[in-house]
Amino acid sequence: MAAMGHLGDPYALRSVADLPPPFRSVFGFRYFNSLQSECFPACFLSDVNMVISAPTGSGKTVLFELCILRLLSRFLSSEWRFNLIKGTLKTIYIAPMKALVQEKLRDWNMKLGSLGISCLEMTGDNEFYNTKSIHDADLILTTPEKFDSVSRHGIRDGGLGFFSDIALVLIDEVHLLNDPRGAALEAIVSRIKMLSRLGTMKIAPLANVRFIAVSATIPNIEDIAEWLAVPSEGIKRFGEEMRPVKLTTKVFGYAPARNDFLFERRLQSFIFDILMQHSRGKSALVFCSTRKGAQEAAQCLSQTASSLGYSNPFMKSMQQYEHLKEAALTCSDKQLQACLVHGVGYHNGGLCLKDRSVVEGLFLKGDIQILCTTNTLAHGINLPAHTVVIKSTQFFNKEKGLYVEYERSMVLQMCGRAGRPPFDDTGTIIIMTRRETVHLYENLLNGCEMVESQLLPCAVEHLNAEIVQLTVSDITLAIEWLKCSYLYIRIKKNPQHYGIKKEIPRELLEKQMKDICVEKIHELGEYGLIWTDEDGFLLKPLEPGRLMTKFYLKFDTMKLIVKASACCTLEDLLHIICHSAEITWIQLRRNEKKLLNEINADKEGRLWFHVVGANGKRKKRIQTREEKIFILANDCLTGDPLVHDLSLNQEMNSICSNGCRVAKCMREYFIYKKNYKSAISSMLLAKCLHQKLWESSPFLLKQLPGIGIVTAKALKTAGIDSFESLATADARKIESVTGRNYPFGDSIKSYLPSLGPKIDINIEDAGNRQGKSTIIVTLTRLSQAVGSSKQNYADMVVGSEEDNAILFHEKIKTQEFSSPYSVKLYVPCPPNARATLKVDVIFEEYVGLDIHKKHVVSREDFHVTKVFGIKKAEPLYNLPAESCLVSSKTTRTNQSKYHNGQNPLSKEVCVIEDDFRAKAPDKDDNDLEILGTREYNNLASLEAPSFTLLHEEDYEDVPDVLASEPVEAECKSATNNTIFDHIRKKSRDFPNLMLSKSMDSSYEPLILKKMKTSGDQFGLDQSSLHAYEVTPMVFDRTEARVSPNNTDERCRNILTRTAETRSFQFTGKMDSISQKSEILNRTQGKNSTQLAGKKAFEKSKTPDENSLHFVGKRDSSSEKSKALSKTPDENSLQFLGKMDSSSEKSKFCFSSPLADFQPMQCTKQVAASVQPLTIQDYCKDILASAKSSGTGASFLDVKSVFSFL
């Protein structure tokens, strides 16, 4: 490569032959021009970042291509063979406009296609890409907003998966930073810079990403160079001397008219004089903002020229006239024909392809001297002219619904058409604008306009996006992200522009930047969009923040959504949209008030909602922009709006498009909050705004292609106003009533299958289950969409009307879900009351297909026999949605049995169970079971074991978290009159063991979750696995309450000694589950310690402050299990169940009155004051005490003591 880059004369033109052989075919010329030759070493022979400032038309695109080839040279072998590995080195090309992206796409597909380079367009016009196509692409061409939107999905959704392969970023028209849209460009470049610094990217191409930025002439190119870390050799600045054609620029200012529309029309009267003065008989392009404006300008010039007769300045010869006359006859557009014969034409998207080709050919040949066109031609086909006239610097923005200034890049692009290098050595640019904006365009054309950052006004939205993508996870990274922005560069150079004092010291300036960052984070945290720790250091995204990023909403709009009521109606949500920041540009004009007042009066009763005053009556006068938006939205949603004004129509369309996006965000937010009424309302409003129809509109058929308001009215007159009536109507009748020709009726009816199949809802009450009504909701597909490949989606929502809670929600594919599809819900019902269950199937796209059903759950004699769950319940009207358990299946039903217990509880206690997933043996893996309890037939088997020395007490204080597996111990005792008598005597120091009062009233379930640790330990978690019924054996440890002479009896009832194995068994009744577990439950003082699992101990607080619980699972075959056993040959201690893989002696927590005894390390639930202790240590203490008593304990060892214990 070095040989290829032989320098020679630094001022000589570089030859294409200096490139490797595989790359030479990319260029259709032999030599690079002077600008390209000067940049050749930096572009192709190095990997430095670059910023190039040069006039339009000087050949900057070739510099991009040289940098692309430099990257591709990594795939060249030593023999100059090109071996591309697709998608491994990506180039991102970012341009301000879609037209420019599409122009470069066509150009590079032709030039680089022979090398096998895969180019992908990523704009709003092209949605036909997916994750795979992005990963396989070598060159991605996109706009800033689209790339920001795609990458905002983040690591979570794979949106940033391709970032590691980015090796080259090409930024066209980087002066876009000065436009309001520049914030998106600044954000994505900062994002790339942040990700490139991650340690995980060290070996990825992104770690050494290269930035190449080009722009028109700007004065502060050094600031952009500092932002992109461009070294001095990478900064290239070129003046007007690099233009192949010298340009003369003129900016004319005119007095404003009554409105922007009339101002643009008035400029047409000045165009002819300007062309006569500056065009001098040469070709001219007149750029107009709209298609109609281009056509009217051409007609005005044509009429003026025709009035001059033979003195027509646009007609040079009779031969030219004959050519134009023949060409006009080939055009289908009559207005175009009339203009062409006078040497004037117009070009816009409204012409057919043939007419546009004719016009382009005539202009290139010189037969047409004047061509009026829209601004899209500035980025389309190359039609240069000597003179360029920009008629008005404003255009009508469809999204905003008003006239706005052209972006600077657009103006420069149009100016770039001036001057034709092969034919002219000069060119002229004329800009016609308002008087107050003349200086802006003079500075722009002269390269005197400073490029400032536009990030600060929307910094909170972009910072939230970074937090959602996990690129910013703490406050230091947030500050680092801000320092990666162009804002940080400019705020140091021009602090006054950003509201900071000019003479502020550098240290205070840094603090000011940090304060800005902290302020934005505080705002996000205040409204629940992100989570921060107590110190405000750690940052984590929350669902509302993710939704704001996903739907590209402004922060002010998201604040309105977060503050919305949980029971919003359609009217409430429509008011939120009217106040949203996305449409704040819509203003109320004086000449619109009369029409808006008439619409709000609504004498025909068309509107669903009206603007009302404080007295609740309709307002007679519309006074604010929000009221205007509300009226326009309601008028549009009738399906037959009264508004026909062009400007109001544009605003109406913008309200619907932006409002639909806001409503979709509200839909997902209210689903997340489980607010049933607001969620249903937002689902309906989103698709109504999309279709511009209320669900009860008589013009629902407008949703079908080919049916407009006129056809819909004709069908309604004939009684065909719904999809059902259209399906049954005769095709010939449809054609007759609409006045359309065959086969219109068949064509319309053929679209019906694309709406989706018919679905039926069935709600079945399957009885009561532990204080809950078992409801089975079944969806059945009644028809199949035949001949339609379109995929339709619907939301299935089950909600409770009384507590406004979503009990179940799922998005389904209407053509593909397994029919019948059943969902089982266990719905709590208050005593002597009714609970209303609502089931809705809301189709995502089409209005008028939704299904709604209601079911009333009623229980007259309501009581709960057992408490299942982890906490005391609330009545239904206060019950959270999580209390409703769901079992979702396709055709099977749950076979679990119900309790027949005899222990009733208070009526105000309802069943609450945690959701979890479990696979039953008789169910498919795909079936989802969300159950909260395990039931048993024989409640008598759960009775408490009898102990001679124990007495029952009422269990008054129910603990919040209990053990999960039932173990009752049958304890036997056997003693010898040996040294162990001393141990018995010592045991008198231990408190009595007593059964809790709760044993005769209720059984509390415990949740058990296996938590892997390095020591094969297990921890308790109340939100995991099954909630089992248990009968806890409560050993209440208090001061000794029995006399010494009954101690032996107590030991005989508790301890059983087996001589052969020297082991003692605690046995209990096992449950039907085959697993085995032991749980030791102890409470010392007010600190409770919980250890649970297959090997676990749990300590919990009881009314007597100190009690010991032994619980375990029951074996389904023998109803017995050994809770603790000793293996003589291994001399090791083990718990039945899962053994330690190393066969080491298990350490476990053992109850002791000694304050310095330490339990084993466990999960976070364990009290911090308790420390680990092994059973060996405990036995050693007993043995030492026994030997010191002088009772002949020399033959004992630790193992024998343990066998006794």
Swiss-Prot record:
EC annotation from Swiss-Prot or TrEMBL: 5.6.2.4
Ranges where the Helicase ATP-binding domain occurs: 41-236
Catalytic activity: Couples ATP hydrolysis with the unwinding of duplex DNA by translocating in the 3'-5' direction; ATP + H2O = ADP + phosphate + H(+)
Motif extent (DEAH box): 172-175
GO cellular component term of the entry, any: nucleus
Effect of deleting the gene: Complete loss of fertility due to defect in meiosis. Normal vegetative growth, pollen viability is severely reduced, male meiosis I is defective.
SUPFAM superfamilies assigned: P-loop containing nucleoside triphosphate hydrolases, Sec63 N-terminal domain-like
Domain SEC63: 541-852
Matching CDD domains: DEXHc_HFM1, SF2_C_Ski2
InterPro entries named in the record: DEAD/DEAH_box_helicase_dom, Helicase_ATP-bd, Helicase_C-like, Meiotic_Crossover_Helicase, P-loop_NTPase, Sec63-dom, WH-like_DNA-bd_sf
Pfam annotation, one family: HHH_5
Segments of skewed composition (Polar residues): 1075-1091
Amino acids binding ATP: A54, P55, T56, G57, S58, G59, K60, T61
Gene Ontology BP annotations: reciprocal meiotic recombination
Primary subcellular site in the record, as a coarse category: nucleus
Domain of life: Eukaryota
Tissue: Transcribed preferentially in early stages of meiocyte development and during meiosis in young flowers.
Compositional bias per record (Basic and acidic residues), positions renumbered to this chain: 1095-1122
Keyword Nucleotide-binding attached: yes
Region (Disordered), start-end ranges: 1075-1131
Function: DNA helicase required for crossover formation, complete synapsis of homologous chromosomes and bivalent formation during meiosis. Is specific to recombination events resulting in interference-sensitive crossovers (class I meiotic crossover). Works cooperatively with ZIP4 to promote crossovers.
Family: Belongs to the helicase family. SKI2 subfamily.
Protein name (database record): ATP-dependent DNA helicase MER3 homolog
Species in which this protein is naturally found: Oryza sativa subsp. japonica (Rice)
